Amino acid sequence: MRLVIVAVGQRVPDWAQTAWDDYAKRFPFELKVELKAVKTEPRGSKTVEALVAAERGRIEAALPKGCRIVALDERGTPLTTLALAAKLQNWQLESDDVALVIGGPDGLDPAFKQAAHERIRLSDLTLPHAMVRVLLIEQLYRAWSINANHPYHRE
């Protein structure tokens, strides 16, 4: 099974890339994690609707065929770490690839969010996109560690 993080925005600070790389290498062979960064639509004189629609096309092109789509959305379902661990366990049992999608500066296209299988919220706080990537991969690793009885997570 693969966890594919599809994120709008190709540039992240070095610290975020270092953190991403550190967590990505910790995952076991049977649970691969990969990042697909797609280009942010240039602003110009376009409306927000036009921007997120263009980004939607890039996101959809990056999605693995037949995957479960989970949109990160500020109005999505809030999760605890244990709830995320339970979701991860269910996803692994289904054995389909899961794409977790992080929108750009203007968020995700409303139609894309509506079509997603799930919408989740990582935090009530507004976070920089680079931080979201790191937070997401860390929480996915933590969820895996809970399910595997690995000592990384402590209650």
Curated annotation (Swiss-Prot):
Record's catalysed reaction(s): pseudouridine(1915) in 23S rRNA + S-adenosyl-L-methionine = N(3)-methylpseudouridine(1915) in 23S rRNA + S-adenosyl-L-homocysteine + H(+)
One Pfam family named in its UniProt record: SPOUT_MTase
Protein name as catalogued: Ribosomal RNA large subunit methyltransferase H
Keyword DNA damage tagged: no
EC number: 2.1.1.177
Subcellular location: Cytoplasm
Description of how the protein assembles with itself and partners: Homodimer.
Similarity remark: Belongs to the RNA methyltransferase RlmH family.
Presence of the UniProt keyword Membrane in the record: no
Organism the protein comes from: Albidiferax ferrireducens (strain ATCC BAA-621 / DSM 15236 / T118) (Rhodoferax ferrireducens)
Broad enzyme group: transferase
